[in-house]
Amino acid sequence: MRIESMNAIQAIAIAILQGATELFPVSSLGHAVVLPALLGWSLPQHSQTFLPFLVFLHLGTAAALLLYFWRDWWALFSGVIGFAPAHHVPQARRIFMLLVVATLPAIVVGGLLEHMLRALFESAPIAAFFLVVNGGLLLFGEKLRGAASPYPQTSDHEVTERRALSTLTVMDAFTIGCWQCAALIPGISRSGATIVGGLLRGIDHEASAHFSFLIALPIILGATVLEVPKLLHADIAPGVFQTAALAAVAAGITAWLSTAFLMRYFRDHDSWALKPFAFYCIIAGLGALAWLHFA
């Protein structure tokens, strides 16, 4: 099936869905697989061009993350090349190293398991099941976050102080990177898994989300570099790239708005921030499984 079977309305809808769910801890890939199946859309999910099309949308998401965190990336870039003030260089290089450490596990594991995961990508019931698992993972992170903190707790088990992003160690980054590998399974959220990894290392929601969104950029760009060439050489009808470009813009705008909302949300609701997303994933996943089974 050729990619032209996805009409413009479907492409824009998938783009908006991608832009929001890539950052929200609810699994963008899981939604991209499950929702079309629920709506009865005949999308080319079994085509070699479907995943590259989704990654093309990731390019819009990556642009949104780069624009939103441009100060962070400029500080890192200028520090790494020694262009920043001397007292900023060591910290910039240290954080850059942490980003590299956190990114490597997903690159290695993804490279080893790519073909098996491709089969999982095509199955809406499996993605719906792991959406439920994702909800449980988020609840697990919230439940155990206090036990992982080196700081004292109050009588109601709320942590009185949390670690900031600047305190991350190499082991913190590696642990978060290992958690990111779980998101290679459709239905498991990359941002959710990495935020949980940060919480279990005693980092607060806002700092965990900040680091999660920073390491998202190289992962998304890496996936784009690997997949988009396949799209360029696929059997694609005229006009598809115009539709894909429009969809990428829609995904980018949605991703920027989602990032702005989430950074404020995680800052203002540190004691229970993941719970609403957890309940949503469990209910949505169970509902999708029931619909796919009985419909």
UniProtKB/Swiss-Prot annotation:
EC number(s) given by UniProt: 3.6.1.27
GO process annotations (BP): cell wall organization; peptidoglycan biosynthetic process; regulation of cell shape; response to antibiotic
Domain of life: Bacteria
Listed Pfam families: BacA
GO cellular component: plasma membrane
InterPro entries for the chain: UppP
GO molecular function: undecaprenyl-diphosphatase activity
The reaction(s) this protein catalyses: di-trans,octa-cis-undecaprenyl diphosphate + H2O = di-trans,octa-cis-undecaprenyl phosphate + phosphate + H(+)
Record-annotated membrane-spanning stretches: 12-34, 50-70, 95-115, 120-140, 209-229, 243-263, 272-292
Subcellular location: Cell inner membrane
Topology class, membrane: Multi-pass membrane protein
Keywords: Antibiotic resistance, Cell inner membrane, Cell membrane, Cell shape, Cell wall biogenesis/degradation, Hydrolase, Membrane, Peptidoglycan synthesis, Transmembrane, Transmembrane helix
Chain's role: Catalyzes the dephosphorylation of undecaprenyl diphosphate (UPP). Confers resistance to bacitracin.
Miscellaneous comment in the UniProt entry for this protein: Bacitracin is thought to be involved in the inhibition of peptidoglycan synthesis by sequestering undecaprenyl diphosphate, thereby reducing the pool of lipid carrier available.
PANTHER family referenced in this protein's UniProt entry, alphabetically: UNDECAPRENYL-DIPHOSPHATASE
Similarity comment text for this entry: Belongs to the UppP family.
HAMAP family: Undec_diphosphatase
Protein name according to UniProt: Undecaprenyl-diphosphatase
Source species of the chain: Granulibacter bethesdensis (strain ATCC BAA-1260 / CGDNIH1)
Taxon lineage: Bacteria, Pseudomonadati, Pseudomonadota, Alphaproteobacteria, Acetobacterales
Gene behind this protein: uppP
